[in-house]
């Protein structure tokens, strides 16, 4: 059977994505560990926002808070906005079989924006809290508008939508 036909029959994995604004309106990004980055990903394009799967029976907002904590240690947040729509991306053909046990053609994501209200000492990525697996080797705050230029190519269109969705959402506390 043709791989392209198989791909089209695979479902999208339901996920959440998280935008965290600091008090200056900058956005938290983490640089993917080499073992999670794809072989041809340039170092400058290994950055991404926290994201992850929605567990069976879990509400997207709860999943967003859980994933944010598991990946970053961040719990001190205030919800700013939920994206109106779900955004999706397909995995590139070369990654099929290497990503998520070949069960999905890509991911469909509900995005949330939060205000970080804690102290920087709360952020823990390597290692993250509660024996979670580290996914990031570095983190930094960047301008929201810069996101599409620092992520892997097959996610750029989603990040453009995220920027458009949450542009102007940050308000100083």
Curated annotation (Swiss-Prot):
EC number(s) recorded for this UniProt protein: 3.6.1.-
NCBIfam families on file: PRK00714.1-5
Gene Ontology BP term (one): nucleoside phosphate metabolic process
A Pfam family per the record: NUDIX
PANTHER family according to UniProt: NUDIX HYDROLASE 26, CHLOROPLASTIC, UDP/ADP-SUGAR PYROPHOSPHATASE
CDD domains: NUDIX_Ap4A_hydrolase_plant_like (cd03671)
Protein name in the entry: RNA pyrophosphohydrolase
Motif (Nudix box): 52-73
Family: Belongs to the Nudix hydrolase family. RppH subfamily.
UniProt keyword Hydrolase present: yes
MF (Gene Ontology): bis(5'-adenosyl)-pentaphosphatase activity; guanosine-3',5'-bis(diphosphate) 3'-diphosphatase activity
Keywords per UniProt: Hydrolase
Cofactor: a divalent metal cation
Job description of the protein: Accelerates the degradation of transcripts by removing pyrophosphate from the 5'-end of triphosphorylated RNA, leading to a more labile monophosphorylated state that can stimulate subsequent ribonuclease cleavage.
InterPro entries with a match to the protein in the record: Nudix_hydrolase (IPR020476), NUDIX_hydrolase-like_dom_sf (IPR015797), NUDIX_hydrolase_CS (IPR020084), NUDIX_hydrolase_dom (IPR000086), RppH (IPR022927)
Domain of life: Bacteria
Domain Nudix hydrolase: 11-164
